[in-house]
A protein has these predicted regions:
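Bacterial Sec-dependent N-terminal signal peptides
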Residues: 1-23
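N-terminal, polar/Ser/Thr-rich
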Residues: 16-44, 69, 139
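Juxtacatalytic substrate-recognition/specificity segment
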Residues: 20, 47-49, 147, 176, ...
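Extended, low-hydrophobicity, Ser/Thr/Pro/Gly-biased non-transmembrane segments
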Residues: 48, 102, 107-194
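Coil residues (strongly favoring Ser/Thr
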Residues: 56, 79, 92-93, 124, ...
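Solvent-exposed beta-hairpin/edge-strand motifs
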Residues: 57-83, 142-155
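Post-HExxH zinc-binding segment in Zn-dependent metallohydrolases
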Residues: 263-264, 268-269, 302-343, 421-425
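Amphipathic alpha-helical substructures
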Residues: 364-437
């Protein structure tokens, strides 16, 4: 049952974004100012985005919701805001046209003024994520951000990163969220606080907040303490958690878990599993705060899913080894691997390096079954001390940055004196099945 739920979560959450894109422009930062009023179904947004092209360009392609109502798009030139012609050249595909072109390596500030539709008046809850394309983005880019959101009094705002300030006014409240470390996505939750119950816990100076609907205080306390234990483990073994806060939020709209940097949205069905003390998905999304939502694999490139899913799964197993013991670790490693072996080497099998999306049961099992097995072999070949040193250096070098598979191999080579570990890794991820040793 646990295996099926976790595989279902893999398929649901990670198939929201299927469009592949390799950007030719670097996104340096976002500064977003948003406002929501009770008499409007739209989120009014002014967004500043700094870009830096590596080459001379006359046009730039963004992924951006076709449902947005754009008022203007401009760029800053000689202290003046100049209008940019634009057009949607496909669904959620926004093309900016620079009549005089833009120069390589220069930094350009873009300003987008637009409104994005919400359903606040229908159910008093706004949940939008990267897959909604609510802000202009490039799929393979990460960037730091600052986000200011003004909402009606009594409403709360959650985003990625840290909550910097809350300012109360007569009829409204202004929230400021920020991440100085780059993030892969900007989720946004706006909700009526009175409808949710809250639990909080302080661990290692990190405030863990849990907002929930379908649990009692004892169940919520167990969930939040499990999250705290996971954070403690990864902080001690890999490196410091990059934020002062982690927010857990129950969502009734889907069944799985959606993870962002500092924000984890828990579907009601997943919460039911946690209430029964099955914490697999929670442990995974906590691990992803280090690798997945802390260190970011290069989206759309070979090895993306192996690094962003299989590696966090193995980190989860490392936590289980310490908390549940070696026998439980081996059992949990073996269970999905046996499921994978049922079709290993056959038509539905795919080399790990070639998986483009976990959009089938078989692909999910390859990532969740074979993937962690591969990391267990690399761990064993390195030895405990070198393996932990490898993880710590990987995190230190790439937290808030994009990690390509090539860079991942370079990091491994520092702990591979005779090349045997890289040779083993290449064999395991480029071939179908479980190659004989």
């Amino acid at each position: 049952m646990k295996l099926l739920i976790l595989l279902f979560w893999l398929i649901i959450v990670f198939t929201q974004t299927i469009l592949s894109q390799t950007s030719i422009v670097n996104v340096n930062s976002y500064d977003i100012d948003a406002k929501l009023t009770l008499n409007s179904e739209n989120l009014d947004i002014t967004l500043l985005c700094q870009i830096q092209p590596p080459d001379s360009l006359s046009e730039i392609q963004f992924i951006f919701s076709s449902e947005s109502k754009i008022r203007s798009i401009k760029y800053l030139k000689d202290d003046n805001w100049i209008s940019i012609p634009y057009q949607f050249n496909g669904k959620d595909s926004l093309l900016l046209l620079f009549e005089s072109g833009i120069l390589p390596d220069n930094k350009y500030d873009l300003r987008f003024e637009y409104s994005f539709p919400t359903n606040l008046l229908k159910d008093s809850l706004v949940i939008i994520d990267r897959g909604h394309r609510w802000y202009p983005l490039m799929l393979d880019q990460v960037a730091p951000f600052k986000f200011t959101c003004d909402v009606p009094k009594g409403y709360q705002v959650f985003a990625a990163g840290d909550l910097i300030s809350v300012r109360d006014h007569k009829d409204n409240t202004t929230f400021l969220w920020e991440s100085k470390s780059a993030v892969f996505k900007l989720p946004l939750i706006i909700f009526n606080r009175t409808r949710f119950k809250e639990a909080a816990f302080d661990s290692l100076g990190i405030v863990i907040d849990f907002f929930y609907l379908n649990a009692d205080s004892i169940e919520a306390s167990r969930v939040i303490k499990e999250a705290a234990n996971s954070i403690k483990f990864y902080s001690e073994h890999i490196g410091n958690y990059p934020y002062k806060k982690l927010t857990l939020f129950e969502v009734t709209q889907w069944e799985g878990i959606n993870t962002g940097s500092g924000l984890i949205m828990i579907g009601t069905q997943s919460l039911e599993m946690m209430k029964q003390k099955y914490y697999d998905a929670l442990n995974l999304t906590i691990a992803q705060q280090w690798i997945g939502a802390g260190v970011f694999a290069k989206y759309g490139s070979p090895g993306f899913w192996f690094l962003s899913l299989s590696l966090p799964h193995y980190l989860r197993l490392m936590y289980l080894r310490q908390t549940q013991g070696e026998e439980y670790f081996q059992q949990t490693l073996k269970e999905p691997l046996e499921k994978y072996k049922e079709f290993a080497g056959k038509e539905n099998d795919i080399p790990l390096i070639n998986i483009d999306s976990p959009n089938s049961r078989e692909k999910g099992l390859i990532l969740y079954g074979k993937g962690p097995f591969v990391f267990s072999k690399i761990h064993k070949a390195m030895g405990d001390e070198k393996w932990l040193s490898f993880l710590q250096n990987l995190y230190k070098s790439f937290c808030g940055k994009i990690l390509t598979y090539g860079e991942f191999e370079k990091q491994i080579s520092r702990y591979d004196e005779n090349g045997s570990i890289l040779a083993l890794l290449k064999k395991l991820i480029t071939q179908k099945g479980i190659p004989e040793e």
